A protein has these predicted regions:
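Intracellular juxtamembrane helix-capping segments at the cytosolic ends
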Residues: 146-160
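Juxtamembrane intracellular "pre-TM" segments in multi-pass secondary transporters
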Residues: 21-46
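Structural signature of the two symmetry-related core transmembrane helices
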Residues: 109-124
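A late C-terminal transmembrane helix in Major Facilitator Superfamily
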Residues: 161-192
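Paired small-residue
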Residues: 121, 132-140
Length: 193
C-alpha cells in the first residue's frame, strides 16, 4: 500500500518539472538586494506582520485540541481531530472567501478587520470561563488569521515590486520564526500563570 501511495509524489515531481515558472521581475531589471531590503522601512513592517501572522496562527492551533478535549469532553484522539479541524476549516474558509470576493474588497480593511477579530478571539480563548467557549474562540481565530499570511505576501508584492525572490524568502523566514516562537511564548506564559 505504501508503494502505491509513493507513486503520487513521484508523479507530482515529474509533472512539476514541466510547469513554467514566471519570473518575479521584468527582463532587464534587477531585484532588490538583501541590503536594499534591510534599509527599507516597509520591509521591516512586512517582516513584523509575517512574524505576527505565524505566531498568531500556530499559537492557537497548537492549543485547539486541548480546548476541544476539555470543552467537548471527548477523548484525546477526537480532540486532536476536532479542535485543529475547526481551526483549519475556518482558516481555509477565510482564504477561499477572499479568493472569491477579493477583487471587490479592500485588502487593508479586510486585514484590519481580521486583526480586530483575532484580538477578540484571543480574549475569548484566554478569558472565557468555559473550555467550549474557548474552543469557539479557537475556531474564530482560524478565520481571523486566514488572510494574514497571504495578505502580507500580497501587500509585499504591491509595496516592493522589485523585491524578488529574496523578499519572499525572508518573509517566509519571518513567518516560520513566528510559527515556532508563537507556541513557545504561549506555553511560557501559560506556565507562569
Amino acid at each position: 500500500m505504501a508503494l502505491i501511495w509513493a507513486i503520487v509524489p513521484i508523479v507530482n515531481g515529474i509533472t512539476f518539472t514541466k510547469v513554467p515558472i514566471a519570473t518575479l521581475i521584468e527582463e532587464g531589471e534587477t531585484g532588490m538586494t538583501i541590503r536594499e531590503l534591510c534599509r527599507n522601512k516597509t520591509f521591516w513592517i512586512l517582516m513584523l506582520m509575517m512574524l505576527c501572522a505565524g505566531a498568531s496562527e500556530q499559537g492557537v492551533s497548537q492549543w485547539a485540541s486541548t480546548f476541544a478535549e476539555q470543552g467537548l469532553g471527548v477523548t484525546k484522539t477526537i480532540g486532536d481531530l476536532a479542535g485543529p479541524m475547526a481551526f483549519a476549516i475556518l482558516m481555509g474558509s477565510s482564504r477561499a472567501f477572499y479568493g472569491k470576493f477579493g477583487d471587490r474588497m479592500d485588502l487593508d480593511k479586510f486585514m484590519i478587520g481580521s486583526s480586530i477579530l483575532c484580538i477578540i478571539s484571543y480574549l475569548c480563548i484566554s478569558l472565557a470561563p468555559s473550555a467550549f467557549v474557548s474552543l469557539i474562540g479557537c475556531s474564530i481565530c482560524g478565520f481571523s488569521v486566514g488572510i494574514m499570511w497571504p495578505g502580507s505576501f500580497s501587500k509585499a508584492s504591491m509595496a516592493l515590486r522589485r523585491g524578488g525572490t529574496s523578499l519572499f524568502a525572508l518573509l517566509a523566514l519571518a513567518g516560520d520564526v513566528g510559527c515556532s516562537g508563537g507556541p513557545t511564548l504561549v506555553g511560557f506564559v501559560s506556565g507562569i500563570l
